[in-house]
Amino acid sequence: MPKMKSHRGACKRFKVTASGKIKRERMNGSHNLEKKNRKRSRRLHQSTLLEGTKAKQIKQMIQG
């Protein structure tokens, strides 16, 4: 049986930390920032961690 391929789109969007958690960037933080307040745009530039079932699914997609 051939090797499983990793999902290339998921590999570009998610990173695995050293402790094994999945890190992702927030959406809505790249353009049209003039209508969003400073607190919101600052928060949108921070990355966040995935939790629960979604993290398991993404981990399987990345590892292939």
From Swiss-Prot:
What cellular component terms from Gene Ontology apply here? cytosolic large ribosomal subunit
Q: Keywords on this record?
A: Ribonucleoprotein, Ribosomal protein
Do you know which InterPro entries this protein is assigned to?
A: Ribosomal_bL35, Ribosomal_bL35-like, Ribosomal_bL35_CS, Ribosomal_bL35_sf
Q: Which Pfam families match?
A: Ribosomal_L35p (PF01632)
Here the disulfide bonds are none
Q: What Gene Ontology molecular-function terms does this entry list?
A: structural constituent of ribosome
Annotated GO biological processes are:
translation
Stated family = Belongs to the bacterial ribosomal protein bL35 family.
UniProt name for this protein: Large ribosomal subunit protein bL35
* Organism in which the protein naturally occurs: Chlorobium chlorochromatii (strain CaD3)
Gene name for this UniProt entry: rpmI
